[in-house]
Amino acid sequence: MSYSGFRVMADSTPTLKKRLSGRSLYLVGMMGSGKTSTGRPLAERLGYGFVDADAVIEQAAGCSIPEIFERDGDAGFRSLESQVLSAISQRHSLVVATGGGVVTQPENWGLLHSGIVIWLDVVPDQLLQRLNADSTVRPLLQTTDPEASLNALLNERRPLYSEADLTVVINDETPEAVADGILQLLPSLLQDPTQRRTD
């Protein structure tokens, strides 16, 4: 199920929270797609807890994500990421901002689908603009041609992201507007579970 363009929520948030029955919401998408900035207001509106998986990984490793990549490589980082996701999935009533590459490990999908997976699909031009304005060090973009690297990653991951239960296409909406759009879309998914993972 996909959604683009946001309008006023039809279902009240308390009713929606009850219908979710404690299922966590996992936000997936490329780096810079706004998973953390959208996740916080989404969690606040639902009365859920918020978890930034990358922050938990850094806490567990005792160093930054770029340092983990430098020390342990991509495979080492992905292993730690899966361990952290497994621990997070034991809890409920959370909005979880995941790392951009969490979808690349098949074993993570069983954990993600313990809740509802929401893909924040930012149009490529907007994504590049966001990343250029962001001072965060992105290990996978430390190349001579970051734009080409970003496009290659997006092409590789797009089929994986499309396995999400909900797809929200984002242009230049604010994180708060995206959070409201997700809340507007969720009742349809909960009403008809057969719509999960369809576009």
From Swiss-Prot:
The keyword DNA-binding does not apply. Pathway: Metabolic intermediate biosynthesis; chorismate biosynthesis; chorismate from D-erythrose 4-phosphate and phosphoenolpyruvate: step 5/7. Mg(2+) binds at residue 36. It is found in: Cytoplasm. ATP binds at residues 32-37, 138. Its cofactor is Mg(2+). It is an enzyme of class 2 (transferase). Its EC number is 2.7.1.71. Substrate binds at residues 54, 78, 100, 157. Binds 1 Mg(2+) ion per subunit. It catalyses: shikimate + ATP = 3-phosphoshikimate + ADP + H(+). Belongs to the shikimate kinase family. Catalyzes the specific phosphorylation of the 3-hydroxyl group of shikimic acid using ATP as a cosubstrate. This is Shikimate kinase. It comes from Synechococcus sp. (strain CC9605).
